[in-house]
Amino acid sequence: MSDFPPRLLSEEQHLLSGCLAQDRQAQFRLYQQYKAAMFSSALRILGDRALAQDALQEAFVDIFQGLAGFRQQSTLGAWIKIIVVRRALLTLRREQRMEVYDQDRHPEPLVAWHDNLTGEALDKAIGELPAGYRAVFCLVEVEGYAHGEVAEMLGIAEGTSKSQLYHAKRLLQRKLHYLYQ
């Protein structure tokens, strides 16, 4: 039994049917319906608006190409979020490889950062977490997913999700300790 009202399910089914039939208006409505929430998820993982927008566009290409494979074991929104998160993680890994290559050629000088704004400091500290830690932290602490759901989304064990969250929190505490002194 579903927790969603029948009207909502039939609207989602109608939208899905239109997208499967390559109806451009249905595809546009699907994109419009989910773009803001999915952009926020990608942005939290990537920490860069341009990269998040690129990842979102690539994810929606993946979504439209893979819609026939949607088995309706979850809501359409949950399935879309999994694809967006995975695409954002792929983008993050690609960018990190490019960044390492770039730093080898042009090392940047060390820059001291002195943020007085807690929100900015937290955003920066989250952005500096290793990719896996950041993804798990954002999905559990910001998005509110359970470890089982995160494990499924990221293709990791539930214990790994819990461990990565623990280590992410420890790193954040160390990075932000100066705010509480």
Model region roles, listed by residue range:
Residues L20-A21, R44-G47, Q57-T75, R94-Q96:
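Sigma70-family region 2
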Residues S40, D54-V61, S74-R86:
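Structural recognition of an alpha-helix C-terminal capping motif at a helix-to-coil junction
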Residues Y31-R49, G66, I126, H177-Y178:
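Amphipathic, Lys/Arg- and hydrophobic-enriched alpha-helical face
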Residues V136-V140:
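A short pre-motif secondary-structure segment
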Residues L16-S40:
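A short, charge-rich alpha-helical start-of-domain segment used by transcription regulators
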Residues K81, T91-W113, L117:
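Short, basic/polar amphipathic helix motif occurring as a linker/hinge flanking DNA-binding modules
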Residues D48, A146, G155-T160:
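Helix-turn-helix DNA-binding motif, specifically the short coil turn and the N-cap/start of the second
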Residues R71, R93, L129, R134, ...:
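Short, Lys/Arg-enriched C-terminal cap helix and immediately downstream tail that follows
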